[in-house]
């Protein structure tokens, strides 16, 4: 079944590519990329109490992803990103569970459009907004959140390109079966003010019918020539808590510095904790669970041998502490991003 779906998917790509050869085509294919990454990872566990130190290591293919975008007439655009090597995510191991997004945009005007299909759950923050293939170490929240669900959003962009607002209703990322009747209600703002950019959201997400966990997610980014840094803060809370702020938090800081055209040196640190409830109680937050405390620090570099972003080598290391238990990790990997639409013979 999976092979048949994959062949159908590739046939659709070939069909769209054939249509895109004609400059007057009703359907266009504007972007077609194949992205993949493979890593060698070494974990060292120092040991604690009666547990002896241990080392684990091995090679792993991380991602194999096809992404395509195009237009249908003058009012519609389509967008698809498919993980060919999708893990068992969600409540059903199906080909569609490996679809990050598959949605249509309907442009009412130059400023207003409706988006419908499987799409990113609109939560603020620049770590959350990053392509997973570009994340080497993530927070506990990033590692556990389900990012993609079926739904719809109404979007507004101003003429200057400084503000993008969207309101979204979609399936709750906490669903574990079809037709579960729980939803997420999201309000998102992307701001672009020169060197300063925002990715802010307010979210009400059902984890059971009528029971909500609420997010206020503030993503802040500064971009200068050759330097990019961001600071994300996510506050999670239920209305049933005594204190709404400061009890269940994720904070992330990241910085990357270009060294010429081929090198980037980066550092990242993150911290998750949940003191909103006692452990072993019915959790309001099912991603960073009650009593959890996780922090990590990482440092590394990326090397682009061709001078563009199509081939990347990375080497980085990290220290992670989960509820006081440490782990050290080294990661060496290769990423390549192939533009299939503009390949030359």
Q: What name fits each language-model region?
A:
Residues 23-44, 55-172, 181, 190-192, ...:
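Outer membrane beta-barrel
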Residues 15, 111, 341:
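Phosphate/oxyanion-binding loops and surfaces in catalytic or ligand/nucleic-acid-binding neighborhoods
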Residues 165-214:
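Loop-centered beta-sheet repeat module
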Residues 35, 63-65, 101-103, 151-153, ...:
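Membrane-embedded beta-strand positions in outer-membrane beta-barrel channels/transporters
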Residues 1-24:
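Bacterial Sec-dependent N-terminal signal peptides
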Residues 147-148, 156, 182, 213, ...:
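A structural signal for well-ordered alpha-helical scaffolds and beta->alpha junctions
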Residues 14-15, 86, 333:
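Hydrophobic alpha-helical membrane context
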């Amino acid at each position: 079944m999976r092979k048949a779906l994959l062949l159908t998917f590739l046939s659709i790509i070939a069909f769209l590519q054939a249509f895109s050869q004609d400059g007057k085509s009703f359907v266009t294919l504007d972007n077609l990329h194949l992205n993949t990454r493979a890593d060698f990872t070494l974990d060292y566990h120092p040991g604690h109490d009666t547990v002896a130190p241990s080392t684990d290591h091995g090679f792993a293919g991380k991602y194999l992803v096809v992404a395509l975008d195009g237009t249908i007439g003058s009012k519609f655009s389509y967008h698809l990103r498919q993980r060919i090597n999708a893990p068992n995510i969600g409540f059903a191991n199906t080909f569609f569970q490996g679809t990050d997004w598959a949605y249509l945009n309907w442009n009412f005007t130059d400023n207003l459009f409706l988006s419908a299909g499987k799409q990113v759950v609109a939560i603020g923050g620049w770590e959350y907004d990053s392509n997973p293939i570009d994340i080497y170490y993530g927070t506990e929240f990033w590692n556990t959140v389900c990012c993609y669900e079926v739904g719809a959003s109404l979007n507004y962009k101003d003429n200057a390109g400084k503000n993008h607002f969207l309101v979204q209703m979609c399936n709750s990322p906490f669903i574990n079966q079809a037709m579960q009747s729980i939803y997420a209600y999201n309000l998102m703002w992307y701001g672009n003010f020169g060197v300063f950019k925002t990715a802010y959201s307010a979210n009400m997400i059902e984890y059971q019918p009528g029971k909500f966990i609420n997010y206020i997610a503030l993503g802040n980014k500064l971009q200068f020539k050759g330097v990019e840094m961001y600071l994300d803060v996510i506050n999670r809370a239920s209305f049933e808590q005594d204190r709404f702020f400061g009890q269940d938090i994720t904070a992330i800081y990241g910085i990357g510095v270009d060294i010429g055209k081929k090198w980037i040196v980066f550092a990242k640190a993150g911290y998750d904790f949940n003191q909103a409830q006692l452990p072993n109680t019915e959790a309001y937050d099912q991603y960073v669970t009650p009593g959890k405390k996780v922090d990590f620090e990482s440092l590394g570099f990326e090397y682009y041998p061709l001078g563009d972003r199509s081939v990347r080598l990375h080497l980085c290391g990290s220290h992670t502490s989960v509820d006081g238990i440490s782990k050290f990790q080294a990661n060496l990997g290769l990423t390549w991003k192939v533009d299939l639409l503009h390949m030359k013979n």
